[in-house]
């Protein structure tokens, strides 16, 4: 308040006003700052003062034949004086209005074809249903998501060749259209865009949107397919969410879904064959999804799912180092371990053979309703920071992390026999046996885990064995965060192809 008063007093003195309005800016550093380089330093200001001028626009001289000097109200549309430094004409913003109202019209037949992605988006929104709005704490996780619905899955290079061939067919330069989808799209687009009057550069931009998958690393709670991402700003805030059902599907989401289903079926069938790797590769090569060979889709599609990763690894493609356990995606962000087989005794004196991971490791755990950061050593949970939608979701994440830690107190908490089977009536492996057991009832596990006093840390709270929050005590090593925990970012480590192939046969 004081500062404002002081400024008011200063401005009331005529000398101040004179200094501010009449003094020239002649400090070299300032002049340099605003005049070096082609980049506009203050676009908003520039636009403001340009529009305050009578003729802020320059146009080609031909405009003088196409637009009258004055409009119906007698306002001048262009000035006879040339623009300094070029032979262009100075034009008023009113000329734009005149042109929009009275200028030549052209055929609009190509607009829906070129701006196809926008027209389709409008249709999806028109037929979508919104509401109701719920107010609750939103746990958002940054995930890599697809942001332009309705695209084909070409690589940037493939799309570039198609665009050059469609938009600039007479330009020089080698263009090799090899894949089937490239040839089909090129033929289709050339026919669609015959005699198109829309600026070629605009057509090229719009084609890029249609052909290439664009992904961003965004905080999301809920649906991650592209038709949900396009309305992210309407469906979730910091403390609210709005229900939304999209008004239509798009090809890329269908392909992602079909790819996961196909990969799972292939992996399942390959597992029981005499040569799993060979049969998996053969099936990948002979399968088509939406008329495109599955191997071509696998090369371009970034979908991260266990079965899809196995197929990619078998083909020698790079895969990210993530795996699933108990409905959570685990990504190792630090550390390393070696596997050793050990025999352990449960609380029911049943012997289990488990593969123990020896070494210090850090993971991010990402599930549908909860996320966590886990730090562990050999058969010991060091720290678990978990965040979730509700008590139930947080409990699920804690159980999975406790089982994954392979701690002795977890194995000793088993009551009764472990004899869970899968759908094919085969016994589950020991780690999944333990998980199923505690997912049914985790009371003993939580009671036996132990509790510890906690420090007061901003945004963190403790959780007791009965899953109630506490500011004083918490399950040993476990804390609940009020903020979401991010999925590992795009800079994640990637498993090299030569290694992934070997891992793949082991996974099968």
From Swiss-Prot:
State any GO CC term. host cell mitochondrion
Pfam families on file:
Flu_PB2_1st, Flu_PB2_2nd, Flu_PB2_3rd, Flu_PB2_4th, Flu_PB2_5th
Q: Which domain of life is it from?
A: Viruses
Its localization reads: Host mitochondrion; Host cytoplasm, Host cytosol
Keyword Glycosyltransferase, does the record have it? no
Principal place where this protein is found? host cell
Which InterPro entries does this one have? Flu_PB2_2nd, Flu_PB2_CAP-bd, Flu_PB2_middle, Flu_PB2_N, PB2_helical
Q: What are the record keywords, sorted?
A: Host cytoplasm, Host mitochondrion
What the protein does? Answer: May participate in the inhibition of type I interferon induction through inhibition of the host mitochondrial antiviral signaling protein MAVS. The knockout of PB2-S1 has no detectable effects on laboratory infected mice.
* Protein's name according to its UniProt entry: PB2-S1
> Source species, please?
Influenza A virus (strain A/Goose/Guangdong/1/1996 H5N1 genotype Gs/Gd)
Lineage at the top is: Viruses, Riboviria, Orthornavirae, Negarnaviricota, Polyploviricotina
Record gene name: PB2
């Amino acid at each position: 308040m004081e500062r404002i008063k002081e400024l008011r007093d200063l401005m009331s003195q005529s000398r101040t006003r004179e200094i501010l309005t009449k003094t020239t800016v002649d400090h070299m550093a300032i002049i340099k700052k605003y005049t070096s380089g082609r980049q506009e330093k203050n676009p908003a200001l520039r636009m403001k003062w340009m529009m305050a001028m009578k003729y802020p626009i320059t146009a080609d001289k031909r405009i003088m034949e196409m637009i009258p000097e004055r409009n119906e109200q007698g306002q001048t549309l262009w000035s006879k004086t040339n623009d300094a430094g070029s032979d262009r004409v100075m034009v008023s913003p009113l000329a734009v209005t005149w042109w929009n109202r009275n200028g030549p019209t052209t055929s609009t037949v190509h607009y829906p074809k070129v701006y196809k992605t926008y027209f389709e988006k409008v249709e999806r929104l028109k037929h979508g249903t919104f509401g109701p709005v719920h107010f609750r704490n939103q746990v958002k996780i940054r995930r890599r998501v697809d942001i332009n619905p309705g695209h084909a899955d070409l690589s940037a290079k493939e799309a570039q060749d198609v665009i050059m061939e469609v938009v600039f067919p007479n330009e020089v330069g080698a263009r090799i259209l090899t894949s089937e989808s490239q040839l089909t799209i090129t033929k289709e687009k050339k026919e669609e865009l015959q005699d198109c009057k829309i600026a070629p550069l605009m057509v090229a931009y719009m084609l890029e949107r249609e052909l290439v998958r664009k992904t961003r690393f965004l905080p999301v709670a809920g649906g991650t397919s592209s038709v949900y991402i396009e309305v992210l700003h309407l469906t979730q805030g910091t403390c609210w969410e709005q229900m939304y059902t999209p008004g239509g599907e798009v090809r890329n989401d269908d392909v992602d879904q079909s790819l996961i289903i196909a990969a799972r079926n292939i992996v399942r069938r390959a597992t029981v064959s005499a040569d799993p790797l060979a049969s998996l590769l053969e099936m990948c090569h002979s399968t088509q999804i939406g008329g495109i060979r599955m191997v071509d889709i696998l090369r371009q599609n970034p979908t991260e799912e266990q079965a899809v990763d196995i197929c990619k690894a078998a083909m020698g493609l790079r895969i990210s180092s993530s795996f699933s356990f108990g409905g959570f995606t685990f990504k190792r962000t630090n550390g390393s371990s070696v596997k050793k087989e050990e025999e352990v005794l449960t609380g029911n004196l049943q012997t289990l053979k488990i593969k123990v991971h020896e070494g210090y490791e850090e993971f991010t755990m990402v599930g549908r309703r909860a996320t966590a950061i886990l730090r562990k050593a050999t058969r010991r949970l060091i720290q678990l920071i978990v965040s979730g939608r509700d008590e139930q979701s947080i409990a699920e994440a804690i159980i999975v992390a406790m089982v994954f830690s392979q701690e002795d107190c977890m194995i000793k908490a088993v009551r009764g026999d472990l004899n869970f089977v899968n759908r094919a009536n085969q016994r589950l492996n020991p780690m999944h046996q333990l998980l199923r057991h505690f997912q049914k009832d985790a009371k003993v596990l939580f009671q036996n885990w132990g509790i510890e006093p906690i420090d007061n840390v901003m945004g963190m709270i403790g959780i007791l064995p009965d899953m109630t929050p506490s500011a004083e005590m918490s399950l040993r090593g476990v804390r609940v965060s009020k903020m979401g925990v991010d999925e590992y970012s795009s800079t994640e480590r990637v498993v090299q192809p030569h290694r992934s192939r070997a891992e793949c046969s082991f996974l099968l």
